[in-house]
Amino acid sequence: MKQTVKTSRAAGQLEKMFRELNKHYFAGKLPEPIISLKKTPSAYGHITCSKVWQAGGENKYEINISSATLDRPIEETASTLLHEMVHEHCMETGIKDTSNNGVYHNRRFKEQAEAHGLTVDHHEKYGWTITSPSEELLDFIIFQGWQDIQMGERLAWSDMAGTGAGSKAPGSSQTGAPKPPKAKSSTRRWVCPKC
């Protein structure tokens, strides 16, 4: 098998993985999204909350897999993709799986993720968001013969600056000195109840 060292090949592999995971875990019912590869220093991936792409007369979601973390083991990349697919499933079926503007993953997300091949752990701030592949998913990945994607975009210090010094992007080896906490703003914003 050829090494995945081109972005076009990486995107193609992720699209193929989406189709196989969709068939296996969702009976092929999820609409195929646009798969993008962009740096997201604070996350392994994300999905848009609405269908933001128009392609071939169809509106589509976007699932982004962070280009900075593509070179993780394939089971971790597949787990991230499946995590985002669970969000898509929840949006498509009307299940409210997050709160706090999509940041906090609630128990409904946990239930859906566990029903679709993921193991879920709790994070104090973000809820049931820490996902890893279940044994069944690992077996599925091995059966599919998926190979690691052998490329990843390195994060520069400027990429990290916007996320707060001291934060560490998943998969990166960069760290920084902690920033002092921001002082609370005394500015109040008034919104007219009739507008």
Provide a role label for each language-model segment.
Residues 79-92:
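Active-site recognition of the HExxH zinc-binding catalytic motif
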